[in-house]
Amino acid sequence: MIFTAFILDYWYFTLLFLIAAYFIGKHVYTNYLMRKHHAEPILDVVDDGAFGFKFGFQSLKAKKIGNQIDLLFLKFNEAKHPSIGTFVTRSFGMQFIATKDPENIKAMLATQFNEYTLGQRLNFLAPLLGKGIFTLDGNGWKHSRAMLRPQFSRDQIGHVKMLEPHFQLLKKHIIKNKGTFFDIQELFFRFTVDSATEFLFGESVSSLKDESIGYDQEEIDFAGRKDFAEAFNKSQVYLSTRTLLQLLYWLVNSADFKRCNKIVHKFSDYYIKKALTATPEELEKHSSYIFLYELAKQTRDPIVLRDQSLNILLAGRDTTAGLLSFAVFELGRNPEVWSKLRQEIGHKFGLDSYSRVEDISFELLKLCEYLKAVLNETLRLYPSVPRNARFAAKNTTLPHGGGPDGMSPILVRKGQTVMYSVYALQRDEKYYGKDANEFRPERWFEPEVRKLGWAFLPFNGGPRICLGQQFALTEASYVLARLIQSFETLELSPEAAYPPAKLSHLTMCLFDGTPVRFE
């Protein structure tokens, strides 16, 4: 009775005692875990300001002006020991570890793969993408990967001839703008959604066909086709913000977000219904390869088909469009690189009126070494997924970041977020020299690049390495080769800012587009 009265009369002392006990207990338990896992305290702690809300709002502000990716890049340089490449900070109250250390990334993606998960990613992305290969963990992910892997064999990704009709439409748009500066990034996104929907569904949305190049708008036979690309884009903006807000993701669930998701789902459901109405015998007899029809041989569940198709569509459209946009941006400001590419492509496939389009194949494109170097250098400076995250499935460690020299293991508590920046890693002078921020394809012919290992990760690594990497590289190689065959010069607008602002949703592209001129 007296004890209860004391607590009620001096509740503030009780509260202070409980708070102190909590932090002391947490400190003692953390030290115990560090001893158990042979870990050291993390060397760098970056000031987050007001429980990370300062950094969180900085990120939201930077996102609006195309500087969000560079903000994290600068945080690495502002750390007390920038060469360590690992620090701890907060965002919107959540503590997380940020790293660009190749060994730490290798641990999460490969050697300690089972100790790290995607965490809340399914909750962030499910309204649009559902349960697909990019949102699932564990057995669900294993099943998805086993189901999708056969769809990306060389026979499927090597059919470059299907790209030519789409390139001809792209070329008409370029010719229409010939001699003037225009944004080709917007056209690349239309090109890749056209080619991706043909690969996935057997029928292109033909977004490049419009009145500006002499086409009447195609009559649509179901609602949502015209609005699909716009809705898909807007949904990704919402998903990106949900991801940025982490535990507060549920705040982003507006009526417009739901409307966009409904349009995208209705679009994909149209094709899924067509695939499911076909008998297994009809699916086998289909003359050309269609991703959805092959998938329908393995499952007749319409939700599974929709979710996996949209996951692949996201990767197939956005990564390739971003890669092409950044490549053309750099080629436009580096005419000597464009000239070298013309020499290689001319030697292999001819140029201008002497172009041998029929000779371009998956196998021969892989032999174009300078073209490969240009794409590698583009992916190095502008990785499609510039940053990513993993969450500790249990109390575990990362190899580097602790101790007086930053080379000792650090503790990662169960549920803790680890964000890794491929963008920062691939611009690190430690691995790429003093000119790490410069576009120089020739570096890929130097012996040092053979030693890069996990310092070059444009398509992730480990068991979750991107299934579609050859698909993206083949498509980008084909489009660049055909542009080089078709146009003699490429110039970037003198008004284009450098370095360019970057728009990062789930993947990265140019914030202000790619203003170029072809002749």
From Swiss-Prot:
Its cofactor is heme. It is an enzyme of class 1 (oxidoreductase). Heme binds at C466. Gene3D superfamilies: Cytochrome P450 (1.10.630.10). It comes from the Eukaryota. Belongs to the cytochrome P450 family. This is Cytochrome P450 52A10.
